[in-house]
């Protein structure tokens, strides 16, 4: 949600920001709708004041034993007008409807561009392995070892699902524990276990609704299956006013995530790269405005640390204005090297949403400024650290051996009963 006062003060800047995010100019329309709403509110307050005066007059006349039929009739007429204006305000949702579908304003340092071709590489880490044999895909390796079954999954649920067996099922669990241990024991995140069914209001709070209603699974009673733990974790502070001394709040969770992948027809149709259901470890931070920028850098470092421990080559990209998510003001993607595709693929996305989500959730913090207590909207950040399915892909492909076995990364072996190989 946007600050209308900011738009009124900076209409050209706001339009420039929206155009950079591939949206049309809307500042003038927002200003006009806001003026219309305020005119109605002014009329409403004036009528309420007039009715209160007449009410006091009626009470005095009754006390004095004087007839007050004229005043009573006037009060009824004013009440009807008040009801009419209240109905007009309720029905006139154009301003809110428009604000609900406009993305966040990009940070000043975000590169301008229409799509991923304008994303900027920040740094690389690790070395790509030179194979002396023909590299296999993760699904070729998994199916050959009889540890990955797409056919049986399709019988159960359709396309874009997978069944992991034995050592790969164990690897899936091991990765979750490995990541959560890093986040909680070394970086101070609090682990949360949360529902995977949420109210639509929670989806609205983080910006998933109303614009992306077709991207998530809807159940009866207006529940949604979470597309990411970000939804649940961020909404834990919905409606709260937090003491600034209690910030930052850092939360982490591993949960199944569910996505319709409505716009992904023909993309990554084989394997685990793009699934309707997958496990992911998520990081969420609730911070003050002053903590916001440094918290994003810290979050990216936490996600990078997982890949460093697994000794997987990766790069960090800053997304351009046209490629960022709806609620993000600035986003860093971490992309891991996938040998069979000879390219980097996204494995983590870390975003600073600034006060965009907090305005939708009405989440504030209290601070002292010039000896005066002030409430401000909190800043929220989220990041995947990491998507477990894609981490499995990266391990299988980067650690594959000529005989089709997979060497288990050293950092994971204590989570895998000290096994050295998947075979």
Curated annotation (Swiss-Prot):
One of its GO terms (cellular component) is cytoplasm. Pathway: Aminoacyl-tRNA biosynthesis; selenocysteinyl-tRNA(Sec) biosynthesis; L-seryl-tRNA(Sec) from L-serine and tRNA(Sec): step 1/1. It is found in: Cytoplasm. Its main location: cytoplasm. Keywords: Aminoacyl-tRNA synthetase, ATP-binding, Cytoplasm, Ligase, Nucleotide-binding, Protein biosynthesis. GO terms for biological process: selenocysteine biosynthetic process; seryl-tRNA aminoacylation. InterPro entries: aa-tRNA-synt_IIb, aa-tRNA-synth_II, aa-tRNA-synth_II/BPL/LPL, Ser-tRNA-ligase_type_1, Ser-tRNA-synth_1_N, SerRS_1_N_sf, SerRS_core, tRNA-bd_arm. ATP binds at residues 259-261, 346-349. It holds the Pfam family tRNA-synt_2b. L-serine binds at residues 228-230, 282, 384. GO terms for molecular function: ATP binding; serine-tRNA ligase activity. Consists of two distinct domains, a catalytic core and a N-terminal extension that is involved in tRNA binding. This is Serine--tRNA ligase. The lineage of its organism: Bacteria, Pseudomonadati, Pseudomonadota, Alphaproteobacteria, Rickettsiales.
């Amino acid at each position: 949600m946007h600050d209308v006062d900011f738009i009124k003060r900076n209409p050209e800047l706001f339009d420039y920001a929206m155009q950079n995010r591939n949206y049309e100019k809307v500042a003038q329309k927002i200003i006009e709708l806001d003026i219309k709403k305020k005119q109605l509110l002014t009329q409403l307050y004036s009528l309420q004041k007039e009715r209160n005066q007449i009410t006091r007059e009626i009470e005095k006349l009754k006390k004095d034993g004087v007839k007050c039929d004229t005043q009573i009739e006037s009060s009824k007429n004013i009440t009807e007008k008040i009801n009419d204006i209240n109905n007009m305000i309720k029905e006139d949702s154009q301003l809110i409807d428009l604000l609900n579908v406009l993305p966040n304003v990009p940070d000043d340092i975000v590169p301008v561009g229409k799509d991923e071709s304008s994303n900027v590489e920040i740094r690389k880490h690790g070395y790509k392995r030179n194979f002396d044999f023909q590299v296999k895909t993760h699904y070729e390796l998994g199916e050959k070892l009889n540890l990955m079954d797409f056919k049986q999954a399709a019988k159960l649920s359709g396309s874009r699902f997978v069944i992991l067996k034995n050592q790969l099922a164990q690897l899936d669990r091991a990765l979750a524990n490995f990541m959560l241990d890093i986040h909680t024991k070394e970086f101070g995140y609090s682990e949360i276990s949360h529902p995977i069914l949420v109210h639509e209001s929670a989806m609205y709070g983080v910006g998933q609704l109303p614009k992306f209603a077709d991207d998530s699974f809807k159940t009866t009673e207006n529940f949604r299956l979470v597309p990411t733990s970000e939804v649940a974790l961020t909404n834990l502070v919905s409606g709260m006013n937090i003491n600034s001394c209690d910030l930052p709040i850092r939360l982490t969770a591993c949960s199944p995530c569910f996505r319709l992948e409505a716009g992904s027809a023909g993309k990554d149709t084989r394997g685990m790269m793009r699934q309707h259901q997958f496990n992911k470890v998520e990081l969420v931070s609730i911070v003050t405005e002053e903590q916001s920028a440094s918290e994003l850098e810290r979050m990216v470092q936490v996600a990078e640390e997982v890949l460093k421990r697994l000794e997987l080559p990766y790069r960090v990209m800053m997304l351009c204005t046209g490629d960022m998510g709806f609620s993000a003001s600035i986003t860093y993607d971490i992309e891991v090297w996938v040998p069979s595709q000879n390219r980097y693929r996204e494995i983590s996305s870390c975003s600073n949403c600034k006060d965009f989500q907090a305005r939708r959730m009405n989440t504030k913090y209290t601070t002292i400024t010039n000896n005066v207590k002030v409430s401000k909207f909190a800043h929220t950040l989220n990041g995947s650290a990491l998507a477990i399915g894609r981490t499995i892909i990266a391990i299988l492909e980067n650690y594959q051996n000529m005989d089709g076995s997979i060497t288990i990364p050293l950092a994971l072996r204590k989570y895998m009963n000290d096994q050295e190989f998947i075979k």
